[in-house]
Structures are given as C-alpha cells and as structure tokens.
C-alpha cells in the first residue's frame, strides 16, 4: 500500500501538459546557387605534408617512450634502509609505520 500512495504523488508531475502551440509547422528552405556562396568542397592536402606530419608524430612518440625508460631506470631503495627513509622522508614522518620506512 505504501507504494501505491507513493506513486500517486508523482501523477501530477507526469501528467501530459497541453502544448501552447497546437498546429504543425512546415519549413521550406530554398537552395541558393549564388557565386558568392563559399564552396563546401574538401581540399586535399599534399601527400608530402601528411607524411611529414606522420613522421613528426612517430618521432615525438619515440622520444616520449625513451624519456619514460630513462626515468624508470632509477632503482627503488630497499625498504627500511637509510636511503629509503631519506627518499620517502615525508611519508615516514606522517606515517611511521609505512612499509617503506621499516623492515
């Protein structure tokens, strides 16, 4: 019964409200053939420009991947060592029981 009274409160919000404009509208659009109209043709790029862009993108991706490898070569210190405590000093101060700070 509770669900019946609950749905009854939604009926006024769901009821269809009559539209202010009653009739249907018809729009007619005339095509323009003026010489002043800008052309919608797609201009083709030369293949050399596209190749240059492709090679530049490939070179940029290669540089980014090499930079990631160079940054990843730095080894993590073993947990509990002085090097680990020095590198993660802020973590060790705020959470002294963190695994990196102790054995």
From Swiss-Prot:
InterPro entries: PSBT (IPR040296). GO terms for biological process: photosynthesis. Keywords: Chloroplast, Membrane, Photosynthesis, Photosystem II, Plastid, Thylakoid, Transit peptide. Residues 1-75 form a transit peptide. The maturation of the PSII-T precursor to its final form occurs through a two step process. First, a stromal intermediate is formed, which, upon translocation into the thylakoid membrane, is processed to the mature protein. May be a component of the oxygen-evolving complex. This is Photosystem II 5 kDa protein, chloroplastic. The lineage of its organism: Eukaryota, Viridiplantae, Streptophyta, Embryophyta, Tracheophyta.
């Amino acid at each position: 019964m509770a669900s019946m009274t609950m749905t009854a409160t939604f009926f006024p919000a769901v009821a269809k409200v009559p539209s202010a404009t009653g009739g249907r509208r018809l729009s007619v659009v005339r095509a323009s053939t003026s010489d002043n109209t800008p052309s919608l043709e797609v201009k083709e790029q030369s293949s050399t420009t596209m190749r240059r862009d492709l090679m530049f993108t490939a070179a940029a991706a290669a540089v980014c991947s090499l930079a990631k490898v160079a940054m990843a070569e730095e080894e993590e210190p073993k947990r509990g060592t002085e090097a680990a405590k020095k590198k993660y000093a802020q973590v060790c101060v705020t959470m002294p029981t963190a695994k990196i700070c102790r054995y």
